[in-house]
């Protein structure tokens, strides 16, 4: 079996869900009687469709997850993770404004996992560029996290273990 990362890190906005939690929706959030997560105005708030399956797959492979987000809406982001029942998939959460470098340095300190044993999924190129400099295998997300992106990301990670590390911006199987 191919080598697996020791930690899979996910951005939140436009990676797990299709919005910016600090501008496009209106916290606080709640779960309605039909199980739908809604914001203060009653607007439905959803994950990208395959996100729960992606996280279950990683869990079944024994790969722990973490969240790393630069949002200023810290409480709202954590509330959504709880309402979507995603806390169980994330052993650590680094959710606060600032550089993703700081998020990863703290994740490395908390877990003891080397950067080279981490994989990171994010929709913003600047984060991919910054974090890849640490030696993390970085995967650029274009239309939300899905199973195909996970499989391609794990393949990229496995290849990086046998050669020089690179981000998916250089040779991306996700871009047309």
Swiss-Prot record:
Annotated catalytic residues: 11 (nucleophile), 13 (proton donor)
Organism: Homo sapiens (Human)
Keywords: Hydrolase, Magnesium, Metal-binding, Protein phosphatase
Function, in words: Magnesium-dependent phosphatase which may act as a tyrosine phosphatase.
Amino acids binding substrate: 20, 70
Residues holding phosphate: 12-13, 69-70, 100
Keyword hit for rRNA processing: no
Protein's name according to its UniProt entry: Magnesium-dependent phosphatase 1
Regulation: Inhibited by vanadate and zinc, and slightly by calcium.
Positions annotated to bind Mg(2+): 11, 13, 123
EC number: 3.1.3.-, 3.1.3.48
GO molecular function, one term: acid phosphatase activity
Family of the protein in this entry: Belongs to the HAD-like hydrolase superfamily.
Taxonomic superkingdom: Eukaryota
NCBIfam families linked to this entry: HAD-SF-IIIC, MDP-1
Cofactor section: Mg(2+)
Signal sequence, start to end: none
Reactions catalysed, as given in the entry: O-phospho-L-tyrosyl-[protein] + H2O = L-tyrosyl-[protein] + phosphate
């Amino acid at each position: 079996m191919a080598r697996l990362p020791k930690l899979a890190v996910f951005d939140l906005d436009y990676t797990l869900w299709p919005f910016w939690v600090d501008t496009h929706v209106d916290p606080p959030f709640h779960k309605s009687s039909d199980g739908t997560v809604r914001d203060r105005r009653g607007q439905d708030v959803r994950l990208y469709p395959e996100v729960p399956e992606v996280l279950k797959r990683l869990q079944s492979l024994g790969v722990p997850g973490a969240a790393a987000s630069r949002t200023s809406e810290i409480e709202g982001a954590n509330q959504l993770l709880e309402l979507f029942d995603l806390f169980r998939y994330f052993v650590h959460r680094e959710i606060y404004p600032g550089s993703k470098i700081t998020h990863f340095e703290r994740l490395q300190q908390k877990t003891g996992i080397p950067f080279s044993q981490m994989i990171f999924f994010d929709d913003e190129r600047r984060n991919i560029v910054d974090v890849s400099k640490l030696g993390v295998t970085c995967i650029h997300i274009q239309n939300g996290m899905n199973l195909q992106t996970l499989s391609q990301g794990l393949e990229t990670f496995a290849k990086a273990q046998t050669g020089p590390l690179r981000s998916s911006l250089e040779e991306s199987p996700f871009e047309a």
